[in-house]
């Protein structure tokens, strides 16, 4: 929690106002933020200065792992995070590539599981990484990226947290995740959970020990209509100790994640929090 609160205070005290064309709002912005999560000791980075709904964050990333491209599939997992971008984004609604209600296009997990080659074939980036790590191989290119500029026009949203690099040192697995843009009051809450859980899951299904997860954010910002709640409410609260994340030990393969895993296979233990804060969301 300390590093999260320090970033929030840094934005409030040092940030500069930047106009955002997509949302029509101004953002208080800082450039470059680095966070670390201790996955080895299960220090689950769940925000405690407001109630955090962690299941939706894990459900969303599970949808990425499965390569989902439809908001209805994400809802079935337990998260509505793609409803607005799939169905209320004006630019996407006018895009001729949109295939109807709930279609997200070729975003996130689609790129991770079915990146298109020039000859029409696809590359399953995640499968390659899992196969290598399971064999104890780190070719220094165990990289999963959702960032495909050639297909930005085929999706409703460019990826924010776009690239994940795995590093194997002995039998300990580490993760470095890169994020181009972060809505700190709303998005970072989700993204921290996802980075931590992704490393924990990948270590579990490849038979490795989880180490540290490193989370690099380029543009960290607070929207103008979020600033008062952050400055005058959330930053006035004292944080509680971090909880633990328990993952069903029966999850042993990528196929398990693709097929039968649900939110019932995850449990957070020892979570204490302050009251919820309803921050505005910008589509």
From Swiss-Prot:
Name under which the protein is recorded: Thymidylate synthase
Binding site for (6R)-5,10-methylene-5,6,7,8-tetrahydrofolate: 183, 282
Keywords, alphabetical: Cytoplasm, Methyltransferase, Nucleotide biosynthesis, Transferase
GO CC, one annotated term: cytosol
Pathway as given in its UniProt record: Pyrimidine metabolism; dTTP biosynthesis
Coarse class of the protein's main subcellular location: cytoplasm
One of the GO biological process terms: dTMP biosynthetic process
Location relative to the cell: Cytoplasm
Subunit structure: Homodimer.
UniProt keyword annotation of Ribosomal protein present: no
Single GO term (MF): thymidylate synthase activity
Catalytic activity reported: dUMP + (6R)-5,10-methylene-5,6,7,8-tetrahydrofolate = 7,8-dihydrofolate + dTMP
Active site: 160 (nucleophile)
Protein task: Catalyzes the reductive methylation of 2'-deoxyuridine-5'-monophosphate (dUMP) to 2'-deoxythymidine-5'-monophosphate (dTMP) while utilizing 5,10-methylenetetrahydrofolate (mTHF) as the methyl donor and reductant in the reaction, yielding dihydrofolate (DHF) as a by-product. This enzymatic reaction provides an intracellular de novo source of dTMP, an essential precursor for DNA biosynthesis.
EC number per UniProt: 2.1.1.45
């Amino acid at each position: 929690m300390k590093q999260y609160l320090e970033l929030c205070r840094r934005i409030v005290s040092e940030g500069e106002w930047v106009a955002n064309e997509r949302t029509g709002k101004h953002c208080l912005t800082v450039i470059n933020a680095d966070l670390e999560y201790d996955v080895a000791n299960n220090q689950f980075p769940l925000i405690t200065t407001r109630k955090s709904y962690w299941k939706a964050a894990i459900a969303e990333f599970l949808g990425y792992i499965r390569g989902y491209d439809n908001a209805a599939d994400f809802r079935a997992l337990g998260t509505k995070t793609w409803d607005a971008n799939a169905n209320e984004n004006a630019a996407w609604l006018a895009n001729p590539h949109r295939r109807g209600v709930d279609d997200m296009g070729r975003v996130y997990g689609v790129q991770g599981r079915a990146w298109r080659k020039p000859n029409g074939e696809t590359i399953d980036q995640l499968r390659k990484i899992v196969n290598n790590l399971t064999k104890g191989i780190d070719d220094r290119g165990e990289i999963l990226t959702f960032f495909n500029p050639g297909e930005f026009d085929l999706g409703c949203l460019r990826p924010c947290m776009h690239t994940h690099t795995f590093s194997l040192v002995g039998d300990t697995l580490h993760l470095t995740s890169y994020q181009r843009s972060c809505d700190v009051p709303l998005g970072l809450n989700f993204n921290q959970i996802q980075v931590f859980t992704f490393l924990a899951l990948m270590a579990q299904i490849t038979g490795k020990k989880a180490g540290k997860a490193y989370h690099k954010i380029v543009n960290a910002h607070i929207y103008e209509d979020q600033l008062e709640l952050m400055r005058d409410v959330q930053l006035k609260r004292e944080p509680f100790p971090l909880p633990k994340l328990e993952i069903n030990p029966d999850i042993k393969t990528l196929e398990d994640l693709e097929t039968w895993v649900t939110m019932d296979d995850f449990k957070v233990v020892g979570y204490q929090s302050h009251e919820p804060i309803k921050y505005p969301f910008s589509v």
